[in-house]
Structure formats: C-alpha cells, structure tokens
C-alpha cells in the first residue's frame, strides 16, 4: 500500500492543503511540525494583520479511528488590539491556541470495494472563551480557526504509476468572519514508479495536491525526504500565495 503523509500544516492535522479529507495516519503516529503562514490564509486580518506568521503543532493518532491535535499560531502586537504597549508593536508577543479532532466513522472498502472512507472532524471548536468564543463574529475574538466537517475519500491505484485520491467534504462554521458553509473537493496523486533508477525513487516521494476548499482554489505538494518521517509541504493559496512547512513523524507502534 502507498504510505500516508497528508499533513495539513496550518491546522496540524491530516488533510490536504486547506480542505479536510478522510485519510487517517497509521495507528499510534505522533506528528509534529511548524510552518510559515501567508496572511492570505490567516482567518483574521484585524487580529494578525498583513504579515507572515509561524505556527507549530503536535498531533497523535490515538487509535486507527481517532486523531487529536494541538496547534499554536504566533501573533504580533499591533495598535488597538489587546492593550499591547508601543514598544512591542511588530513583535511576536502572543499565540492563538486551538485543539483539533478527527473521527473515522467508516473505513474505505468496509461494505463494498467502491465505498469511500468517511471522517467527521472539528477544528478549534470551543477554545474561544473570550467574548463569545468560536461562534462570535468579531475578528478579535477567539475560535479563529473554527470549522466542522464531514469528509469522504476514495483511492484509485494505477499499477507501477501511482495512487489517485479523490476527496469531498462539507465544511461549516457559524462565523461571519472566515465563514464556511459549503462543499470542498480535491485530489492528490502519489507516484509509485518502478524503483529502478534514482529519478524514479525521487519522484516516488512526491505527493501532488489540488483543491477547492469551499473558499479558494489551491495547489501544492508534499515531499518525503526520509520515508514519511521528515516531510515538506508547499502550498500556493489561490495558486499564488506561498505557505509551507516541515512535518515530522514518529511511529510509536
């Protein structure tokens, strides 16, 4: 079988670039990493502003059907937000923390070979304790990355060429700012060429991705440098704004 990487770097969970999918990591996989995030993908321009920021995260697949993650996104001080003094303006002084969870409710091929895998999940569901929380419409309030979803994934194998993954999801939240309420669709292709040359082996580490995340069309790739233990993720959000990061994995089982 083709190895699973699929590290959704902004949320610190398994996924494509921005949209959720139904793929799961190996049982007892510990995943951690960090990323540079473009301002175009950050949910609150009022809170963050127009600058690249950094996140870091840790994630564990506790059971083959359950994944839990914790993500932190750094924030710079700016005038008019949260009583920062002028000497701190433009410096990283805070971080937005969020929890994330994914539950596999149906495994691919359980009933018939054509049935997809199905996952339900949530991002940043209840961490907004300040002034209204995750359901608040004000950009300054917490729950910035809040969304709920159901996702389905189906794989198609092409012998000695690669594996195509087709992904569909419905994404929703109750916020006016960074609002989600619609379908998402995406695909990825991971090569599995015959390992007869250095080039073929190098290409086999590449995972190409494209998606419509219910708000924008994005493209990118993931590259595994050492099996799936060290991976790089690169996204062009709206096919032009760069974000990317490194993902590390430890298999505890």
Predicted feature locations:
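Transmembrane beta-barrel domains of Gram-negative outer membranes and organellar outer membranes
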Residues: 5-148, 153-159, 192-198, 206, ...
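Active-site beta-loop-alpha junctions enriched in small/polar residues
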Residues: 37, 73, 123-125, 169-175, ...
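Flexible, surface-exposed loop regions and adjacent strand-edge segments
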Residues: 87, 226, 251-252
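Outer-membrane beta-barrel "beta-signal"
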Residues: 98-103, 185-187, 238-253
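Short, solvent-exposed loop/turn segments at conserved positions within beta-propeller repeat blades
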Residues: 143, 178-180
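Alpha-helical interaction elements
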Residues: 161-169
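Outer membrane beta-barrel transmembrane domains
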Residues: 183-235, 245-247
């Amino acid at each position: 079988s083709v190895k699973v990487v699929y590290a959704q770097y902004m949320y610190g969970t398994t996924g494509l670039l921005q949209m959720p999918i139904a793929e799961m990591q190996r049982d007892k996989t510990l995943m951690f990493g960090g990323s540079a995030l473009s301002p175009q993908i950050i949910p609150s321009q009022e809170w963050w502003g127009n600058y690249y920021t950094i996140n870091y995260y840790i994630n564990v697949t506790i059971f083959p059907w359950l994944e839990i993650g914790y993500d932190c996104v750094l924030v710079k001080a700016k005038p008019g937000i949260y009583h920062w003094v002028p000497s701190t303006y433009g410096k990283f002084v805070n971080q937005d923390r969020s929890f994330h969870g994914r539950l596999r409710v149906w495994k691919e091929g359980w009933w018939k070979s054509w049935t997809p895998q199905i996952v339900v999940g949530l991002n940043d569901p209840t961490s907004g304790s300040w002034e209204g929380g995750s359901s608040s419409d004000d950009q300054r309030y917490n729950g910035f990355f809040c969304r709920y979803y159901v996702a389905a994934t189906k794989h198609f194998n092409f012998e000695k060429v690669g594996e195509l993954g087709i992904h569909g999801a419905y994404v929703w939240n109750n916020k006016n700012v960074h609002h989600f309420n619609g379908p998402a669709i995406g695909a990825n292709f991971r090569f599995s060429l015959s390992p007869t040359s250095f080039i073929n082996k190098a290409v086999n580490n590449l995972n190409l991705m494209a998606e419509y995340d219910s708000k924008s069309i994005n493209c990118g790739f993931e590259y595994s440098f050492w099996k799936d233990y060290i991976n790089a993720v690169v996204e062009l959000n709206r096919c032009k704004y760069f974000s990317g990061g490194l993902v590390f994995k430890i298999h505890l089982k």
